[in-house]
């Protein structure tokens, strides 16, 4: 199984309840497509290096994932690009 780390930035003005639902939804997207979520945690609210969609800050969230193939990651990537609450995301394959 390959190990991946996903970091995504959530818009800072989202309500706590909506943020928790968003995180749960994207964790379930990964598990529904065959990946195993090892860890999913909020990092912190941080200042961005440059403005993204008129926001100067963002809520960072980190997810560690194990997957046999990249189907779950492709689906995560596709859906996070069209979700207005996620400002940016990055998927990195970790060395074994």
Curated annotation (Swiss-Prot):
One of its GO terms (biological process) is translation. One of its GO terms (cellular component) is ribonucleoprotein complex. SUPFAM superfamilies: Ribosomal protein S6 (SSF54995). Keywords: Ribonucleoprotein, Ribosomal protein, RNA-binding, rRNA-binding. Gene3D superfamilies: 3.30.70.60. CDD domains: bS6 (cd00473). Pfam families: Ribosomal_S6. One of its GO terms (molecular function) is small ribosomal subunit rRNA binding. It comes from the Bacteria. Belongs to the bacterial ribosomal protein bS6 family. Binds together with bS18 to 16S ribosomal RNA. NCBIfam families: S6. This is Small ribosomal subunit protein bS6. It comes from Streptococcus sanguinis (strain SK36).
């Amino acid at each position: 199984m390959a190990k991946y780390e996903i970091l995504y930035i959530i818009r800072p003005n989202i309500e706590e309840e909506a943020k928790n639902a968003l995180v749960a939804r994207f964790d379930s997207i990964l598990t529904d497509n065959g990946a195993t979520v090892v860890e999913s945690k909020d990092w912190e609210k941080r200042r961005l290096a440059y403005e993204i969609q008129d926001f100067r800050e963002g809520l960072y969230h980190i997810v560690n994932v194990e997957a046999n193939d990249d189907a779950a990651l492709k689906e995560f990537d596709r859906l996070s690009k069209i979700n207005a609450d996620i400002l940016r995301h990055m998927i990195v394959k970790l060395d074994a």
